[in-house]
Amino acid sequence: VVEELDPFLEEEVRCLGISVKGKEFFPAVGELNPEIVENGAVQAGILPASPKPSLKSRVSLLQLPARPPLFCPGCPHIATEFSLRRLGFYNPSSTSDLPSERKAPAQLKKSGLIVTSDIGCYTLGVYAPLLALDTTACMGASIGQALGLEKAGVPNKIVAVIGDSTFIHSGITGLIDIVYNQGKTTVIILDNETTAMTGHQDHPGTGISAKGAKTRAVSLEALVRGVGVNDVNVVSAFELAAIESTISRCVESDEPSVIIVRGACPLRVRTSGTPLAVDKEKCDSCYACLRIGCPAISVSEDKGFIDASLCVGSSCGICSQACSQKAIVESKQ
């Protein structure tokens, strides 16, 4: 049996009275990769020992470019992450300067935002090109970290980012702490109407029970008002200007605020509009479209290029809103 971490399947098979082997040849910690599996198979006698270079050596010879995890095309989290970056996380003196490299902490200006993140698809915003997040610890930690930074006297404006299912799971008590301790942290709840990262499970906010039956959905708006937050905002996940203006206002407030950014996960709803395309006559090669981190966007002939087979089209449209030249339009093909 080849399995990562604990020998769960191995032990279950052994309980059936079947002779089984596994952890004698494969590690109980860490992540499996082709080289580890190959070595284990050789030790088990499944594969012959080979004089050829190991898989790791052969792969390294290919010198493949790194491919970090990416958001899906049409992900409702992209606009919020892009907005947090564009609002001046690392360069608050300008809303248009989008440096490609992450600056060292010593270079962070005091007026910049600090963004504490949580566990979910939105955690991918820590990677380039977005580089929008500062912390990730465990489920529900983002809100407590944000309040802790505020109460410790950190001069920066602080925003906590958390998903809808994670907020219901372990974020509510953190929000209560903000209200109870008279904090003024802004909490952004990214509501994609599912638990996407672990397989699109439903949660109390979706109105579908664990058995798949319709039930009463928990209203996030009513919930956060119920714990004492007066400044509650709901914005579309695909309205870039609305997201940016709401965040800008809330972080300047002297009371707690919650922004619910709502938009369905495209992998669940499976809806799309007309694919978008780049008008090469209008494109000035500023590559602002690349900085939203959408895998449907690349470069062709020094101009932005959108892969129509990946683009969810006008049902998203974040790239067209980010383009200052209005060069991204609906495809005519």
Predicted features, each with a name:
Residues 12, 284-305, 316-333:
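Iron-sulfur cluster-binding cysteine motifs and their immediate structural context
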Residues 1-3, 20-23, 50-54, 114-118, ...:
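General beta-strand structural signal in soluble alpha/beta enzymes
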